[in-house]
Structures are given as structure tokens and as C-alpha cells.
């Protein structure tokens, strides 16, 4: 089996689970994954605020009956998703939220946008 990058494994997993649309903000933590969404048949729908991405994933789920997926940047980006994810939780919508984390060697050192997730 050929070796994959973490981004390739992430995109392959999303495609294997039938994900066709992902809502989120394009950012440095996901740049390499963004390049391989389209070849995998995944459409990235950009938003201007992570809260909108979470609400859009919830709405997508409610209308389509499939899982909604949103991406938030680490730290403050993911905290912006809380309201939309709470709405999805109470509506019993199958929404998946994905966020990066500070690299293992940098955890606890106050890295860029590090937050206790």
C-alpha cells in the first residue's frame, strides 16, 4: 500500500464516506487538502465566518438527509462553530466538524492559534 500524506488520508476518508460538499474557510492548515478535494469529487464551499459554515452544514444535512461537513481553522476558528454545531446537535442533524491542531511538538507552547480543543 503506498504511503499517504495526512491530507490525502483525510480526503480519501471523506470521499469513502460519501462526502460531496464541505463548508468552511480556506486557511493555511488545510491548503494542501484543498488541492485534492476536487479530484476526489468533493466541492468546497467557502464562507466568510466559521459560524456560517456550521449552520450551512446543518442546513445541508437537514435538506439532503446526508451528513453535513464543516471545516474550521484551529483555535478561534473552531470556537466560532459552536453555535451552529449546537443547533445541529439539538436538531439531531448528522454534522461532522473538522479542525486541525497545533503540531505535536508545539502543543502547550502557545503556538499560532493554539487552543485546548
Say what each PLM segment does.
Residues 1-117:
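N-terminal alpha/beta PP-like core and its mobile active-site loop of ThDP/TPP-dependent enzymes
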